[in-house]
Amino acid sequence: AAILKSKADTLNKEQFSALHYTAPGTDLTLGLPKNHVWESAGAINAQGESFLPNMPTEEVFTAPDFRRAEGYVTSTKPLSYNGNIIEGIKVTFESGEIVDITAEKGDQVMKDLVFKNKGARALGECALVPDPSPISQSGITFFNTLFDENASNHLAIGAAYATSVEGGAEFTEEELEAAGLNRSDVHVDFMIGSSQMDIDGIREDRSEEHTS
């Protein structure tokens, strides 16, 4: 948990303007909101005590600016959603919006998810997971997102967490949307990471730094 917190702290200091993901089948640029917050596993309860709500955990995560996604991304692991196993997902974005989504298996399920749910044509989370992570090294697909998301970098279709921007927990729905946080009734993670993926942070001055 300390290593993850250190990674989150470093990213929070950087305040990258965007992230650029490249890998076979992926070339995606995601804008990040101003004053975005990278979070790690640790949480603090009402008594001020630290605890880990998710075990195991390997991720640091924030929300992308839902209005700023350009390019395409391909999944690297199966997704279990609503009793369906979905494989080979490819998503194409223009101006933040999903304009096309296909899957080698479960194609219609993904199309229905994206095009029939409010706010599901945009992203609500981007999470960085080291490769290899202990879950990925196990070689096991658990078909349970809380486990499988710790195997690789992932994105989430749908709602962003309010805490992904400074002060967001106190924001109204309208203020969250104005800050770039997607509002939706769904939140579905899908895994995109691999040993072949590179992620570069892009600063406001367009300079870049390798992040993962």
Identify the residue ranges that each predicted region occupies.
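Long, well-ordered mid-to-C-terminal structural blocks that present hydrophobic/aromatic surfaces
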Residues: 62-118
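Dual-mode signal for accessory low-complexity, basic/Gly-rich regions
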Residues: 100-169
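Active-site lining segments that contact anionic ligands and/or coordinate catalytic metals
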Residues: 68-70, 86-88, 95-98, 121-125, ...
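Short solvent-exposed loop/turn micro-motifs enriched in small/polar/acidic residues
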Residues: 12-14, 82-84, 119, 148, ...
